[in-house]
Amino acid sequence: MKEKIAYLGMGIWGFCLASLLANKGYRVVGWARNPDLIAQLQIEKRHPQAPDIPLHPNLSFTTDMEEAVNEASMIVEGVSSAGIRPVSEQLKAITDLKVPFVITSKGIEQHTGLLLSEIVVEIFGNNASQYLGYLSGPSIAREVLKGCPCSVVISAYNPDTLKKIHNAFLTPTFRVYPNSDLKGVALGGALKNIIAIACGISDGFHFGDNAKSGLVTRGLHEIRKFATIMDCRPDTLNGLAGLGDLCTTCFSSLSRNTKFGKLIAQGLTLEQAKAEIGMVVEGAYTALSAYQIAKHHKIDMPITTGIYRVLYENLDIKEGIAALLQRNTKEEYL
């Protein structure tokens, strides 16, 4: 009998990785709360955000989480960062973590400032950390679904867990590189979305590629500074989980965070832009916590601060841009 993997969350990214695992021969059971989405997947055999991609026969769907995780040798989550707490609490009511649990979402929880892995440990207990894994890196779902080459990072505290997850996801076109710095991998994926919103705003004002490259470079500097106070290895952010993911998210026309930034530049409010995108915009969610943590630790993060003030304090977008451009220059420190 084929080895079973449970996948919690059937947005486009969840469907993408669930399809990858199904293509490798695993029996994948995808779960989502939305009964309409599950019914559509079961009946039409297509995902509404990828109607041109046929459903693999190894992939099935359910709204019953217990059915999804029962006898699964691995559990993968692909819900929003805001959804990982309620989903983990629902999972805890069904089972303790005794198999690898792979986080593929990117964000920092609002109000608590917890990384998504820390939320899982808080709910399941410290013993759960040995089963935790984190997958991140430059990976636009549509490109992965089409079989385009892609390189990502997988991290875990336990070497055996790391090996199992690495072997499950690795394919000739989906390159998976191990990295032992789980917190650094998680932070890179979370914070790059804020910088992508800034790049989208820059695009919205037609500032050009020079401005965007400057934002990416200085944005990476902000992310590295943030990582130092979170006990991460700053060099992790020079790799796929940091620079790689940052470049893809900031320069891709498929990036929802960049699209969101363009809408903000056009004068839409936070809620209007989110409604227009129609999907979760993780950078908008994470900006609040990132700003609060940076302020608490007295870290100078001007791009992050600017995005936070525009989104949550109704700062005029042009005033925010002017504040960035009028900052005193100093020795470039990388």
From Swiss-Prot:
What SUPFAM superfamilies does the record tag this protein with? 6-phosphogluconate dehydrogenase C-terminal domain-like, NAD(P)-binding Rossmann-fold domains
Against PANTHER family, the record matches this protein to: GLYCEROL-3-PHOSPHATE DEHYDROGENASE (PTHR11728), GLYCEROL-3-PHOSPHATE DEHYDROGENASE [NAD(+)] 2, CHLOROPLASTIC (PTHR11728:SF1)
Q: Where is the active site?
A: K192 (proton acceptor)
Where is sn-glycerol 3-phosphate annotated to bind?
Answer: K106, G137, S139, K192, D245, S255, R256, N257
What name does this protein carry? Glycerol-3-phosphate dehydrogenase [NAD(P)+]
List the catalytic activities from the record: sn-glycerol 3-phosphate + NAD(+) = dihydroxyacetone phosphate + NADH + H(+); sn-glycerol 3-phosphate + NADP(+) = dihydroxyacetone phosphate + NADPH + H(+)
Question: Which gene is transcribed and translated to give this protein?
Answer: gpsA
Cross-referenced HAMAP family: NAD_Glyc3P_dehydrog (MF_00394)
Q: Which UniProt keywords apply?
A: Cytoplasm, Lipid biosynthesis, Lipid metabolism, NAD, NADP, Nucleotide-binding, Oxidoreductase, Phospholipid biosynthesis, Phospholipid metabolism
